[in-house]
């Protein structure tokens, strides 16, 4: 290589390296600037959140909440905001799917008469553009007469604070289920098993899905029960007993009954499990402030894209680590999402 060629080649390499450094530097500066902006916004959000849950005056709490909503909406509109954790916001629920397809942010606020208002946002990936879209959730619980049969959206949301996000795969499709809590009012609480999916080529959320085996019209489960009741709705490995029947055979000295029961078998399955509810007073069907657990536990397990019900005796024999099976009871939820006395 002659001197001219060497000099030309060296200049070309230096120009390329300079271009990469400038490009990387500008990207890094943009990333750093974005991060610092998000940190500043998080500090403002944290201050507003503390006011939302510490002020004794209802109007001050809800005014802080409106400012919180506006500030959070601005923060979520920032580039790369999906990947910012908001760790300081420990009084609201933030659940992110393992596949990074979406995250859902929910919280509730109690007014002076003991009723709860629910708020939330969904950030979800538009697979067509690879961009994350943000949707504010509007609680329309009071306007949903057939709540277990309706598909809902961001503008017609059955408000809840979600504490568990369940993901299962079948036939190259991911199915998502949310478990949620609604403080409702001074008489009753609510829990919900809520499927969530997204419109094709969009990040727009769809709440409710026909994924419950042999329950085609059911879009979700909603449980309402007395504020005095301890209700369980969780997802974990559980043990259950089954008794099987076998056709018996005649013997020389014994005529068999049509069927004979085999001894109990104890099996285990990862499932959503919940208490069956019943009114404490006869004739109070539909008056949910009187509903308490009946003592029966029902399970749902995922198979071939559907949630199937286990009707056998589910045993309280969960040996899993508590860290892997955290499901807050109502008292724990009250500590996470504070209520006013």
Locate each region found by the language model:
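Bacterial Sec-dependent N-terminal signal peptides
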Residues: 1-44
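Beta-propeller blade signature
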Residues: 118-127, 192-200, 292-304
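Start-of-domain marker
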Residues: 33-104, 108
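Short aromatic loop motif centered on NTY/YTY
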Residues: 148-157, 161-170, 184, 205-302
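Short beta-strand elements that form the blades of beta-propeller/WD-repeat-like
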Residues: 101-108, 174-182, 270-276
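Beta-propeller fold detector
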Residues: 132-140, 205-215, 309-315
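A cross-kingdom marker for long, charged
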Residues: 271-341
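Active-site acidic/histidine clusters and adjacent loop/turn architecture
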Residues: 88-153, 257
């Amino acid at each position: 290589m002659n001197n001219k060629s060497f000099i030309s080649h060296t200049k070309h390499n230096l120009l390329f390296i300079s271009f990469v450094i400038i490009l990387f530097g500008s990207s890094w500066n943009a990333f750093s600037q974005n991060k610092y902006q998000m940190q500043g916004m998080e500090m403002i959000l944290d201050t507003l959140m503390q006011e939302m849950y510490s002020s004794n005056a209802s109007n001050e709490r809800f005014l802080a909440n409106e400012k919180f909503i506006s500030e959070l909406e601005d923060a979520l509109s920032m580039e790369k905001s999906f990947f910012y954790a908001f760790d300081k916001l420990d009084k609201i629920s933030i659940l992110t799917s393992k596949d990074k397809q979406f995250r859902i942010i929910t919280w509730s606020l109690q007014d002076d008469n003991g009723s709860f208002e629910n708020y939330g946002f969904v950030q979800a990936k538009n697979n067509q553009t690879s961009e994350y879209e943000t949707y504010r959730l509007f609680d329309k619980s009071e306007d949903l007469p057939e709540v277990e049969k309706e598909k809902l959206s961001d503008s017609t949301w059955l408000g809840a604070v979600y504490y568990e996000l369940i993901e299962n795969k079948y036939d190259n499709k991911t199915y998502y289920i949310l478990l949620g809590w609604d403080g409702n009012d001074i008489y009753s609480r609510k829990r919900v098993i809520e499927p969530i999916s997204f419109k094709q080529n969009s990040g727009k959320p769809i709440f409710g899905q026909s994924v419950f085996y042999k329950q085609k019209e059911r879009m979700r489960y909603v449980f309402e029960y007395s504020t005095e009741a301890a209700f369980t709705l969780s997802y974990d490995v559980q043990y259950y007993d089954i008794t099987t029947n076998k056709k018996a055979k005649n013997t020389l000295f014994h005529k068999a009954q049509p069927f004979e029961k085999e001894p109990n078998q104890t099996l285990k399955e990862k499932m959503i499990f919940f208490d069956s509810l019943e009114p404490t007073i006869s004739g109070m069907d539909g008056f949910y402030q009187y509903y308490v657990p009946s003592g029966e536990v029902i399970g749902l397990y995922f198979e071939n894209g559907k949630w199937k019900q286990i009707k056998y005796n589910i045993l309280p024999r969960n040996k899993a680590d508590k860290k892997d099976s955290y499901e807050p009871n109502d008292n724990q939820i009250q500590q996470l999402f504070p209520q006013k006395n």
